[in-house]
């Protein structure tokens, strides 16, 4: 599926470039640090995003999932990390 594609890679976002780059850095760092535990990785990302951008952020980290969500405009990112995990983050207060 991702063979031959550059990672990290954004699958979808409506964030502006500054926020997108910052959120991608946060997600990649958490995925690198917690590469063996998706739950701790997701919790770490959520805590950082809540502090940096205000609550309430929601995070999914893993492989083989689908999702359909409501979210605040300009507050959604779906990406593949450098560790091949998919990461979806969105804000919905």
Question: For the regions a protein language model found, what residue spans apply to each?
Answer:
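Charged, amphipathic alpha-helical regulatory modules used
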Residues: 1-93
């Amino acid at each position: 599926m991702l063979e031959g594609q550059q990672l990290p890679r954004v699958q979808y976002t409506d964030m502006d470039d500054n926020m997108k780059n910052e959120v991608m850095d946060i997600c990649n760092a958490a995925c690198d640090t917690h590469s063996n535990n998706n739950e701790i990785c997701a919790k770490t990302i959520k805590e950082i995003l809540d502090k940096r951008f205000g609550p309430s952020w929601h995070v999914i980290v893993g492989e083989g999932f689908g999702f359909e969500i409501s979210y605040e405009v300009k507050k959604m990112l779906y990406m593949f990390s450098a560790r091949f995990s998919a990461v979806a983050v969105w804000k919905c207060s």
